[in-house]
């Protein structure tokens, strides 16, 4: 154990100083797909938690920062659709009606643009039955809907750290 600890800093230093060779071959894109670079909104950090295409072809993103952004592909333009959410990490858009749902830390929320200005002005709590604590690692991820209309997501659970994990 002592040898490992004395060698580790040297190995780490070497790894940080010696750059790894760059990959010379470009990534292969599967048939039927294309890659496109999309610039993010200026001054905005997009910690993307969910992505979904709307029926109009626009790309919607929800972020850990609690925002939902809409990217108009043809115009190459970003619009903020919703903000003030609590770590929105999953998004589902109805392919027929464009109804937009987001899962945030404590609930599934339906976002509605009631006046047609491109911004959600109604945040309707659709389901908030699972509870939430103040633990940093308690997240709600992903959002899918089955053919019967049921939503599914993934919940992280909080954990009292680290009493049980410490060795004596």
Task: State where each predicted segment sits.
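Beta-propeller blade termini and top-face loops
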Residues: 23-168
């Amino acid at each position: 154990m002592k040898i490992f600890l004395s060698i580790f800093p040297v190995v780490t230093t070497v790894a940080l100083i010696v750059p790894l060779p760059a990959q010379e071959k470009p990534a292969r894109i599967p048939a039927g797909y294309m890659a496109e670079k999309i610039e993010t909104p200026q001054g905005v950090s997009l910690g993307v938690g969910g992505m979904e295409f709307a029926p109009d072809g626009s790309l919607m993103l929800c972020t850990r920062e609690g925002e939902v952004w809409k990217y108009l592909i043809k115009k190459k333009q970003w619009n903020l659709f919703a903000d003030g959410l609590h770590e929105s990490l999953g998004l589902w858009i109805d392919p027929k009606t464009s109804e937009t749902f987001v899962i945030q830390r404590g609930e599934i929320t339906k976002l509605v643009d009631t006046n047609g200005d491109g911004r959600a002005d109604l945040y309707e709590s659709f389901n908030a039955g699972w509870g939430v604590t103040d633990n940093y690692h308690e997240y709600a991820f992903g959002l899918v809907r089955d053919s019967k209309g049921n939503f599914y997501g993934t919940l992280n659970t909080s954990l009292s750290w680290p009493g049980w994990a410490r060795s004596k």
